[in-house]
Amino acid sequence: MTDRKARRLVALNTGLALIACLVLDVPRPAHADEVDDTALTLVRERHLGDSLGWLGYQVASRTVTFSTLVEALGKTQAQELVQNELQRLQPEFQAQWDANLAAAYAHAFTAEELRSLNAGDDSPELANKFRAKNGEVGADMKARSADLLGNFVSQALTSAQQSLEH
């Protein structure tokens, strides 16, 4: 019986030691708010969300509404009108766009990696991961922001059309 107790004690101590090693070795997960704030800082400081206006124009220029504006005004004036409307509306959508992009980065990177990127860590390993995750972040962003982009473009085109009627 003492042999059995000794084996149990060894097994228990070994198990506890393994658990302790795992717990101490694994970095503590950051709070979601911390990751989101860190990711949002990355997006804002590196101007990663600045493409909203450009993407809005790319989407708008492929619509029937845009073609109608071109027929009514000519290509140059239609482009100018739509770009002006997108620029006017962009501040209403930019904060949510940046938040969605930050969430996509927070999903792809750890809090520590985001902090390193914010601190200007240009280590080859982190730079390679940043490039490698670009597609994943883009797909995540598309899923999060397709409706937002659609609303942005729709409002700009509606506004542009209404300006013709006045």
Q: Over which residues does each language-model region extend?
A:
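Short, surface-exposed loop and linker segments with low hydrophobicity and enrichment for Pro/Ser/Thr
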Residues: 30-34, 107
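Compact alpha-helical subdomains of small soluble proteins
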Residues: 46, 67, 77-166
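C-terminal segment of classical bacterial N-terminal signal peptides
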Residues: 20-29
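A general boundary/transition motif marking the beginning of the first structured unit of a protein
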Residues: 1-3, 30-31, 70, 74-77, ...
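Early exported N-terminus immediately downstream of N-terminal targeting peptides
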Residues: 34-86
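Bacterial N-terminal signal peptides that target proteins for export
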Residues: 2-16
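Short, amphipathic alpha-helical segments
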Residues: 11-14, 22-23, 55-58
